[in-house]
Amino acid sequence: MPRSLTENPRWYQTAVFYEVFIRGFFDSNGDGIGDLRGLIDKLDYLEWLGVDCLWLLPFYSSPMRDGGYDIGNYEEVDAAYGAREDLIKLVDEAHARGIRIIADLVMNHTSDQHIWFQESRSSGDNPKADWYIWRDDDSGWPEARIIFTDVEQSNWAWDSERQQYYWHRFYSHQPDLNYDNPEVVEAMLSIVKLWLDTGLDGFRLDAVPYLYQRDGTSGENLPETHAFLRRLRSEIDARYPGRVLLAEANQWPTDLVDYFGSSDECHMCFHFPLMPRMFMAVRREQRLPITEILAQTPELPDGCQWGLFLRNHDELTLEMVSDEDRDFMYAEYGADPRMKRHLGISRRLAPLVENSRPLAELLHAMLFSLPGSPVLYYGDELMMGDNVYLGDRDAVRTPMQWTPDRNGGFSRADFAQLYLPPLMDPVYGYQAVNVEAEYRDQGSFLHWVQKMLSVRRRHEVFGLGSIEILAVDNPSVLAFIRSYYPESSLAVKDSENFAGNLEGDDASQISTSLDFREDSKEGEERCVLCIFNLSRFAQPASLDLARFKERQVTELLGRVPFPDIQEGDYRITLGPHGFYWFSIT
Ligand code: NOJ
Ligand code: CA
């Protein structure tokens, strides 16, 4: 049955996101570059996979010196990707399949090729002279850190045309816009509207912490930046209800939550500090890195949601860890110097876990059940590999592997014409790892992800529930309870009458299919116990579940009844990197 778009304006709280690098997804016209029509061709696949919202990396016209994050013209789709009409068609076709689409929006900076910058640099008194930040010397704002430390020496760059320095937080070919100029604010708000008018469902806001600078500060998370975000949000709420703003703010939890404001800034923020700690926890085989950061994570304001991720198009960033933990991560995951990029590790998920299927499953099971909306990165559902011999972050941006045919089925262009070579090594190459093969193989990781997402979709507690970390005697075991009691069910909760929940469910029936069992009712679990073994060896665990005495425990994927909770001390054994999702009813 085709899915349709939910009308719930808070759809993003229960959605699963999928990040698409258009350039690398599917090439419809054989020029070696993925494009919007190619993505339209693959929507059926994404619908089958069960994702709810695509996040498109920047598609605007660009010299492509930073994957399109160097915008040359905000008003045009890059010719290699198609045209505005193609985007509108993509949005319509996706919506028809129940899939929403958000686009990356780079507000902080443009390319130095942008016509605004060309004008701005031409003299000190042209109409756009103050659209960027110009100074006679490069001594200003020394407290602001350099983000791309491995390639940039300063946040100031000399422009020989204007004979002045301009400010940039990323590459020197990406000058920062001057948000103290009200014309820049207005120009950006009209660009937002221009694209929302195509039917897009919102934006991932690139590099939001850096919009303003003030003397004596780090130039991050300033009150002026938050005021601008409130303005942006109110304009969107007024004209475009149901759209979402997802902030890319690589910050510590206490600064991060400020991007939700009082539910009047961004609807979502990526949880940057949690991500590296999931990798740390499985390597140390200890839950502490995860539980520590969750303890430091403030409550979400109403209507907000975390964006959770394992990998994305950038390096696995290590900005939000201590120096000691960064050394540990480099030693464990990035030993080869070619893997280090900026302040992180440019590798895909599968090579990071040494192609271990149980470990990839464990990490995804955590991703799908921790509080937030999961954001998948294209190709990770196949356990695709990377190519550390490519420059910058291209290691993780190679073509999607569709088939074992030429160019991995990504493009009919000559190999030499491809924007990047597809993987061809014996382990991760397209002949071994591709959608066609994994789709045919019911036991593949692709099918496992698809099934997990279908289970997750049936239980809104994963998107909406609170979390309580449980004390477990074994430090290698992470356990938490997710609970969600919608307003309408509070009467049931008060009387503690959960008995009816599983009525009619014949859990003893043995399924011969490899599929997880279908639920008899939708969204019935209001209390789910999630338990993970972070160690590569089998582990016992004892949980204090006294307050759930006499409740029924049912494994969620197979609907298999486990022993009821008796006097509180509940004993479980988990296989290597094993996990359970239990409903407690
Ligand atoms: C964050 C993006 O994710 C990254 O790819 C880009 O290089 C920087 N912002 C600069 O725009
Ligand atoms: Ca193309």
Map each language-model feature to its residues:
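Active-site and adjacent substrate-binding regions of carbohydrate-active enzymes
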Residues: 1-492, 498, 502-585
